[in-house]
Amino acid sequence: MKVEVRDDQGNVLGPGEKGELTCSKSFPSMPIRFWNDPTGDKYHAAYFDKFPGLWCHGDYVAETDHGGLVIYGRSDAVLNPGGVRIGTAEIYREAEQVDEVIESLVVGQQRAGDVRVVLFVRLREGIALTDDLRDQIRKRIRSNTTPRHVPEIILDVPDIPRTKSGKIVELAVQRVLHGEAIKNLNALANPEALDYFRDRPELTS
C-alpha cells in the first residue's frame, strides 16, 4: 500500500499539509466491486473519479512527521468559509470538550456568496443553550484552532441523525438546510431527527 496526501490538483503534499487521502498502489483489503453495480460505474465514481488512476478514500487528512495520519473528517463534508478548507473533526474535537455538550454536528450554509459555519449541539439533560454557553463554545474553538473555525451560528437539537452504523450524517443535514432532497433515507437509523434541522428561523437571515 502506498498512501499519499494530495491537494485538489493531485499534487503530493508534505507532512502537516491537509488534503485528500489517496492510495497509488492496490492493497489486499480494498473492495473490487459494489453489489448491484454490474458496469462498475458506481465503484469507479466512489473511488477513482477525483484522481484518475488513484484510489481516493474520501478522508481529509494530514501526514505527521513520523508517517502517521491525522484525520480531520470526510472530505465531502469539509467546510470552506472564505475559501479556507476546514475539517469538521477539528471543530468537534473542541466543541465536545465543553462539559455541557454531549455531541455536535457542523455544516456549511451557503449565504451571500460565501459559506457560514453552523454548529448544532446536543446538550446534557437540563442544560439550556444560553448566550454564555455559546460564548464558551466559541472561545474554546477559537483558542485551539483559528478564527475561521468559529461557528457563526450555534443551535441546540435534541437528537442528531446518524447512519445505522452510527456515523453522523453531515451531508444530509446540509441538504436539509438548503431545501434539497435527501438521498438514501433508509440508510439512517433515525431519519426523524432531520426534522430538528428543518425550517429553523435562525438560519433564514
Question: Where are each of the predicted segments found?
Answer:
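Conserved ATP-binding/catalytic segment of the ANL
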Residues: 11-16, 22-88, 97, 113, ...
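C-terminal boundary motif of the adenylate-forming
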Residues: 58-60, 65, 78, 94-122, ...
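Hydrophobic beta-strand positions
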Residues: 4-5, 62, 161
